[in-house]
Amino acid sequence: HLFESFRKRGIGIAAYFSKADWHVDSYWKDDTKRGKFKSRGPSYRPEENPEEWERFVTFTQNQIRELATGYGRLEAMWFDAGWVCPQNGQDIRLAEVIEEVRKVQPGMLCADRTVGGPYENYVTPEQCVPEKPMTIPWESCITLGTSFSFKYEDVYKSPREVICLLADIVVKGGNLAINVGPQPDGRIPAGAVASLKGMGEWLAEYGEAIYGTRICAPYKKDGIGFTQKDGKVYAIQTFLSETEPVEDEVWIPYAGEFREVTALVYDKLQSF
């Protein structure tokens, strides 16, 4: 139902999957004597327990198959827990299952986070935004509140903060994956809803400068970011505070040629 609700709004689906699973005993055994072995998991050394690890690999691959074949079209699968990787002695043989499910989902991207290689099709900086545009596809994953999970009385970013964050990412060529931890009853917290609705209202007016755009030099300079689409260049100036002064005239540091300047919302020519 969740996936279908997003699809009805024209939003593509990227399914989240944690490669680590502390709820299955083939990964985490409560009675394991770990000694000095203090990694985030598994609770045993795979090289010392190959049969147990193979049980976990089978379980994990079956879950990936289920996600990729039972819920309609997926644009991407987003794999968390980067320490579960061959380089760390925790090989779930992701390549073989991804190649298998891509026969069903031929256009599906794969984000094997922080692992690198052919199955990290885009990188996912966490809780940060790169200073400059990157030469590879990227998507910042950032919490709307202070935690990836739900917290009572959490403090959420204001609509203005989220809008400034989104603009900063898009002008550098990235996407924003914004995290909202649902309440125990499954609902989205009211504070998060207010922030997202505020961003939605802004996008309803200014989304033309965001959706489907590409980066445009000088990307971001003197507080103004640039995007481009369909022969148009968009200059985006954001203000982190309601009290920041707004000048009557704005210097736009764009070196390319242009014929006219239009205010996006008012569709009115500006003098320049």
Task: Annotate the PLM regions.
Residues 1-272:
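Mature catalytic domains of secreted/periplasmic carbohydrate-active enzymes
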